[in-house]
């Protein structure tokens, strides 16, 4: 399927910094609850991410990540996930987070 550039631009993908990460034992699959700061325009949002194979909560704090910020919130057990944190699968299908190679300003939009 081919989409237009205008369609792509409808997906608002922004850069944020993880400020807290904690286990999410109520999730069906191993996951972490993340709090991500997207800067002044977007603010702080929450996300649930199945990333426990490669990341500990402590290692995630301060890490910059990309997330879709304009999907509707999604209830995951007792937790409301407000953004979709982006990653790609490794050779075993486990999620590897996507982020910049250098520190960049919070809230930057991917294009």
Residue ranges and their predicted role:
Residues 1-111:
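Phosphate-backbone binding interfaces of nucleic-acid-interacting proteins
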């Amino acid at each position: 399927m081919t989409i237009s550039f205008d369609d792509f631009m409808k997906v608002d993908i922004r850069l944020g910094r993880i400020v807290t990460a904690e286990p999410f034992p109520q999730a069906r699959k191993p996951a972490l609850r993340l709090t991500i700061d997207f800067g002044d325009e977007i603010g702080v949002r929450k996300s649930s991410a199945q990333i426990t194979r490669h990341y500990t909560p402590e290692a995630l704090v301060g890490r910059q990540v990309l997330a879709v910020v304009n999907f509707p919130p999604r209830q995951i057990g007792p937790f409301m996930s407000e953004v979709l944190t982006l990653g790609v699968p490794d050779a075993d299908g486990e999620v590897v987070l996507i982020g910049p190679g250098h520190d960049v300003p919070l809230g930057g939009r991917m294009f």
